[in-house]
């Protein structure tokens, strides 16, 4: 559960309506793989990840990033029950993929960077604070099955 004020909820949902899920998702995942290269081990089957350019232009990275961000967007509809909304993904990442749950926080950080880059002045400090709460809540929900 994420505790947002009415103003924070309005900021999050209002800005989300402007998000290009395909573009931002690929960029967020690509940044994760470049900035934290040890995360690439989960995506070795994506092909060439040998350089920042290769990662950022890799169609499989872009497609998976879009899928990840679409799931994040679906989660925004369930801010009062993020653990329930992400239960299946939490189990998948824990039991099958064995992803370090810390990586969910790192991806959230990358998403905040991407939102700031694309939304510019609209991504105010207040909007960032609200999104920081949301990405922390999503990361916590995704890590739920690890406990």
Swiss-Prot record:
Disulfide bonds: none annotated. The keyword S-adenosyl-L-methionine does not apply. InterPro entries: Globin (IPR000971), Globin-like_sf (IPR009050), Globin/Proto (IPR012292), Hemoglobin_b (IPR002337), Hemoglobin_oxygen_transport (IPR050056). Keywords: Heme, Iron, Metal-binding, Oxygen transport, Phosphoprotein, Transport. GO terms for biological process: hydrogen peroxide catabolic process. Red blood cells. CDD domains: Hb-beta-like. It holds the Pfam family Globin. GO terms for cellular component: blood microparticle; haptoglobin-hemoglobin complex; hemoglobin complex. The modification Phosphoserine is found at residue 51. Residues 3-147 form the Globin domain. SUPFAM superfamilies: Globin-like (SSF46458). One of its GO terms (molecular function) is metal ion binding. Heme b binds at residues 64, 93. Belongs to the globin family. Heterotetramer of two delta chains and two alpha chains. This is Hemoglobin subunit delta. It comes from Dugong dugon (Dugong).
């Amino acid at each position: 559960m994420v505790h947002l004020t009415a103003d924070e909820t309005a900021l999050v949902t209002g800005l989300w309506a402007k998000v290009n899920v395909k573009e931002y998702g690929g960029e967020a995942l690509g940044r994760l793989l470049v900035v934290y290269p040890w995360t690439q081990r989960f995506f070795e089957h994506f092909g060439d990840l040998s350089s920042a350019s290769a990662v950022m232009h890799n169609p499989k990275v872009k497609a998976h990033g879009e899928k990840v961000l679409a799931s994040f967007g679906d989660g925004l509809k369930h801010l009062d029950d993020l653990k329930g909304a992400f239960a299946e993904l939490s189990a998948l990442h824990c039991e099958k993929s064995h992803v370090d749950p810390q990586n969910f926080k790192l991806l959230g950080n990358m998403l905040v960077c991407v939102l700031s880059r694309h939304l510019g002045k609209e991504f105010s400090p207040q909007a960032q604070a609200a999104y920081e709460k949301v990405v922390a809540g999503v990361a916590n929900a995704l890590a739920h099955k690890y406990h």
